[in-house]
């Protein structure tokens, strides 16, 4: 039974448009895991997704005149090994910025 508890892990995937906000959120999660004596591996940077939008500048003619906009979605991965009940409670109570999307898998 203790072997299955030792093999438990929590995988946290973070997404954000702002890289600095994402890195601060990763630091908070890792500090929380370290204070509850769980081992955290990461943040592992995943590939950044670029989405480019092409828009006509003029509402009427001039199709040659276009404008490009892009959004970049930065992603990070954190694995927390051997989490305790304290670790899970601390992660649930953690206050992270609203611009960061969090996906947790047990």
Swiss-Prot record:
Q: Does the keyword Ribonucleoprotein apply?
A: yes
Which SUPFAM superfamilies does this chain map to? Ribosomal protein S10
* InterPro entries, per the entry: Ribosomal_uS10, Ribosomal_uS10_CS, Ribosomal_uS10_dom, Ribosomal_uS10_dom_sf
BP GO terms, sorted: translation
Subunit-level organization: Part of the 30S ribosomal subunit.
- NCBIfam families of this UniProt entry? PRK00596.1, rpsJ_bact
Q: What is this protein called?
A: Small ribosomal subunit protein uS10
Native source organism of the sequence = Prochlorococcus marinus (strain MIT 9312)
Q: What lineage is on file?
A: Bacteria, Bacillati, Cyanobacteriota, Cyanophyceae, Synechococcales
Question: Which gene codes for it?
Answer: rpsJ
